[in-house]
Amino acid sequence: IQQAKVANNRLQEVYVVDKEEKGKLKELSFKQLAFKGVSHRFSYQQETLSKIDLTIYKGEKIALMGKSGSGKTTLAKMLSGYYTKSSGHVTLDKDAIGHAELRQMVTYVPQQTYVFTGTILENLLLGFEGEVDEKKLLKVCQQADILEDIQKMPLGFQTQVSEDGGLSGGQKQRLAIARALLSKQPILIFDEATSGLDSDTESRVMANLAKIKRTMIFIAHRNSVRQHVSRVVTMVSGQIESDSPNFNPFQFI
């Protein structure tokens, strides 16, 4: 655990965030997060998102679909507070919220995941604050379908890994998913976070995630993701083309 604190310092050196006034967050809970007429552009370029209207309710599992370049990742980073809006309104339970506050609500898992030199445990605890419950650690690893892989390693959670070796691309992605599940943020965004998994492994991971009572958004291009969500949002050219409920065998709150 002590070694993980050192690894956390490494993470802070890698993820450099612009200085900003820290927003006052009421609590890490919400009923709905709403984007109304939100647009985004990079500098003087053409809008990459145009007049987005999207309301996310607590406990929903949403698939954000669309072709490459449709604006899925840009919207995901807007939802995560990493990009700022050029126009429109963002509210949390009908109160205005800034991107600094929004960032505290969301854990974002990108498609390209990274492994830092250190142990499996250190990598799992990067960015994690507070005491780690062993049962919770084992549970999230099982949900991410990475526990068996870890247990087969020479030293288990104390096995040394690095970006250049030790883990396959799929294992890196599942490790990142487990790390996200350890976080306390109520909204999890997975941006093509299962793209490196074979269909059987992806199906197991998605089925596990669908049962977890947290709000999740999956940016994906595989139609197989649809069977694990309650709602499908389709994007075309920076706009939401459709937003409809999806049949889902699971129940959410």
Per-segment meaning from a language model:
Residues 33, 46-49, 101, 152, ...:
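ABC ATPase A-loop
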Residues 74, 107, 112, 120-123, ...:
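ABC-family ATPase nucleotide-binding domain "signature/switch" substructure
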Residues 70:
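ATP-binding Walker
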Residues 1-14:
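Cytosolic ends of transmembrane helices, especially the final helix of ABC transmembrane type-1 domains
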Residues 65-67:
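The feature captures the beta-strand-to-loop junction immediately N-terminal to the Walker
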Residues 15-62, 91, 96-99, 139, ...:
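Primarily ABC-family ATPase nucleotide-binding module
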Residues 147-154:
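Conserved H-loop
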Residues 24-27, 77-142, 183, 204-213:
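Conserved post-Walker A segment of ABC ATPase nucleotide-binding domains
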